From Swiss-Prot:
It is found in: Cell membrane. Residues 22-114 form the Ig-like domain. The lineage of its organism: Eukaryota, Metazoa, Chordata, Craniata, Vertebrata. V region of the variable domain of T cell receptor (TR) beta chain that participates in the antigen recognition. Alpha-beta T cell receptors are antigen specific receptors which are essential to the immune response and are present on the cell surface of T lymphocytes. Recognize peptide-major histocompatibility (MH) (pMH) complexes that are displayed by antigen presenting cells (APC), a prerequisite for efficient T cell adaptive immunity against pathogens. Keywords: Adaptive immunity, Cell membrane, Disulfide bond, Glycoprotein, Immunity, Immunoglobulin domain, Membrane, Receptor, Signal, T cell receptor. Glycans are attached at residue 90. Residues 1-21 form the signal peptide. One of its GO terms (biological process) is adaptive immune response. Gene3D superfamilies: Immunoglobulins. This is T cell receptor beta variable 5-5. Its main location: membrane. PANTHER family: T CELL RECEPTOR BETA VARIABLE 5-5-RELATED, T-CELL RECEPTOR BETA CHAIN.
Length: 114
């Protein structure tokens, strides 16, 4: 593997559309380079007002990033300020990661609840 390959940061989302729970995430797969910014989107199940974001690094369990309820942040995991999120009036949510690092390569999961 050449050193140029180590500069890529791979971000993946679960599924290729609606997942079994009815949550929709986009984009489904994303490749960025270090230093770039990424925005991940989540549409919750209809009627759900709470959205939570998780990061799952290969070989590890999911780690909590954020929870929003009715557009207010209700919880934040131990992640740097490069990670931010927000929730919109329709209860959809965005997760933003700035200045990507190789360690940000992971599966990013969104869950919704009442």
């Amino acid at each position: 593997m050449g050193p140029g390959l180590l500069c890529w940061v791979l971000l993946c989302l679960l599924g290729a559309g609606p997942v079994d729970a009815g949550v929709t995430q986009s984009p489904t797969h994303l490749i960025k380079t270090r230093g770039q910014q990424v925005t991940l989107r989540c549409s919750p199940i209809s009627g759900h007002k709470s959205v939570s974001w998780y990061q799952q690094v290969l070989g590890q369990g999911p780690q909590f990033i954020f929870q929003y309820y009715e557009k207010e942040e209700r919880g934040r995991g131990n992640f740097p300020d490069r990670f931010s999120a927000r929730q919109f009036p329709n209860y959809s949510s965005e997760l933003n990661v700035n200045a990507l690092l190789l360690g940000d390569s992971a599966l990013y999961l969104c869950a919704s609840s009442l």
